[in-house]
């Protein structure tokens, strides 16, 4: 599975809320030798694939044209809506 991601330029609560209202959500990629990277993902693209076991075995994120193989580490969901608030990915 391959997903497009964009590096976040605005950080903080207000910027995250604006992303969620626009149908996206914040995430972070960390691990390995490289520094952690804050990214933005399209909500519907990710949520539609989360029910498949392959999603949790490893996916490819295309971050500014560079392919990074990652595995979902943590998912923060909304309390009562079927929405993802934030995700953590670890490089593999």
UniProtKB/Swiss-Prot annotation:
Gene3D superfamilies: Ribosomal Protein L25, Chain P. Keywords: Ribonucleoprotein, Ribosomal protein, RNA-binding, rRNA-binding. Transmembrane segments: none annotated. InterPro entries: Rbsml_bL25/Gln-tRNA_synth_N, Ribosomal_bL25/Gln-tRNA_synth, Ribosomal_bL25_short, Ribosomal_L25_dom, Ribosomal_uL5_bac-type. Pfam families: Ribosomal_L25p. GO terms for biological process: translation. GO terms for molecular function: 5S rRNA binding; structural constituent of ribosome. The keyword GTP-binding does not apply. The keyword Zinc does not apply. GO terms for cellular component: cytosolic large ribosomal subunit. SUPFAM superfamilies: Ribosomal protein L25-like (SSF50715). Belongs to the bacterial ribosomal protein bL25 family. This is one of the proteins that binds to the 5S RNA in the ribosome where it forms part of the central protuberance. Part of the 50S ribosomal subunit; part of the 5S rRNA/L5/L18/L25 subcomplex. Contacts the 5S rRNA. Binds to the 5S rRNA independently of L5 and L18. PANTHER family: RIBOSOMAL PROTEIN L25/GLN-TRNA SYNTHETASE, ANTI-CODON-BINDING DOMAIN-CONTAINING PROTEIN, RIBOSOMAL PROTEIN L25_GLN-TRNA SYNTHETASE, ANTI-CODON-BINDING DOMAIN-CONTAINING PROTEIN. This is Large ribosomal subunit protein bL25.
